[in-house]
Amino acid sequence: MNIAELLNQNPTPSDVALIDRSKKPAPEVSVAEITNQVHVFAQAMVDLGLTPGSRIGLLAGNLGEYYTVMFGAPAAGMVFVPLNTRLPESTLQYIIQDADLKLLITDVSHAEFSADVPKVVIGSEQWGEMMGGAPASNTMDVEPDDVAIQIYTSGSTGKPKGVLLSHENVTFTVLEYGAALPGEVMLVSAPLYHKNASMASKLAFASGGKVVLLPQFSPGEYLDAITEHRVTMCSGVPTMYALVTAELQKAPDRHDLSSVQRVLIGSAPLTEALFDDVQALFPKALVTNGYGTTEAVLEFGPHPEDLPRPKISLGCEHPSVQLKLVDPDTGAESDRGELWVKSKGVMLGYHGLLEANAERLTDGWYHTGDLMHRDEDGWYFFVGRVDDMFVCAGENIYPDSVEQMLERHPSVHQAVVVPVRDELKGQLPTAFIRSEAGVQMSADDIKEYALKNGPAYAHPRHVWFVDEIPLASTAKIDRTQLIKNAEKLLNLDTEVQ
């Protein structure tokens, strides 16, 4: 099945499926209208002389036309390449060259972006002419393993890698999950170049749900959208919900969140304290800890015997997916180790990177790089990134484990642990702490708590208190920047007590 044919799965194509709040007033669009625009775009690509397999890039924020390109390129048998608008220009230029783009589509805010490929700006006269033509008569026939999407990693630890997702990779996930979502009103505020936002949209359009699309996240707009459109399902990262909570406290009677039935938290480790905060924000909702990788799309599902889900569990092995935990050092399977995934959702590989493919793919198994624990009931829990692990005096330290311990302190709102170089022990753990509002703490308070509640070798040797934690372009904690900050602070001998 072609990705674009997911639109044909919608049981009520004439009903409103998209409320596009990137425009004022927000237009309401049906799947039938989206489908027509998708086929017009597909035919326009053919008329431009582009052939199946050609890479079509999109550098844009959230707007309704995003879906035209997202579905339209694959509808013509071409490959959709979403570009992260938060990446520096040099990185974007690298991606454009690496992907060998044949056409770049941008929104107005990126109209001045210079690239050595043909470019069309959404809303321009050229775009209008292109979208004023006749629709393609049909969707291009594809093989299950034909590439549909080439989405790039953030490149936080090197050059971005192009993840090759086939039509089957994506349609498999949508068809597995979509049956449970008819009638849902989904709030999409994360960038559509991220997997979670684009996948949520595909699920809604295929199942008969509705997408309320925000141009970008802002806590006030987020709350307004929930209230105005009676949103039933939303997702976000922990920092988003912290901002939403603060915004709600300014005018608690202005917003009605009672319509929300499902809340998914993802892209960062979840503590029980944060879980409780989000549950208090949406008291009628089922709050779940979400997990997903760009490379594997689908991993977890409910318990096969319908056991109640522990607060911060990621779920159990999905019935259409194989999971195993592999010890990174010995290669043996156990109840604690690196998560490996095998399913129809696992990527074809990284574009042009044979060495990376050999490291991450083994006989169809994708090595996620995420350390997990599985309990006796089959529930999986996130422990940390294998790559984030560091060694202090011969002892392996997983930052997430130390952070979870520190965040159990009643005065700690958020903790991030990173290593710094040390001549004697190799690396030492350090911590950046966000305290609860109005609380005064000292570095010694944190160190003493860590020594009492965890192994001595893992306690942070240096502690700094900060107002906010830097985020990378993926909205995840920017550990690389924090390591630089820690080393700078130590070199200047400016540890904050």
Residue ranges of model-derived segments:
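Conserved pre-ATP/AMP-binding loop-to-beta segment of ANL
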Residues: 12-16, 134-152, 159, 180-185
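Conserved AMP-binding/adenylate-forming core of the ANL superfamily
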Residues: 17-63, 67, 71, 88-93, ...
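Conserved AMP-binding A3 loop
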Residues: 28-32, 148-172
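Conserved AMP-binding/adenylation subdomain of ANL enzymes
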Residues: 171-185, 193-233, 247
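AMP-binding/adenylate-forming catalytic domain of the ANL superfamily
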Residues: 455-476, 495-497
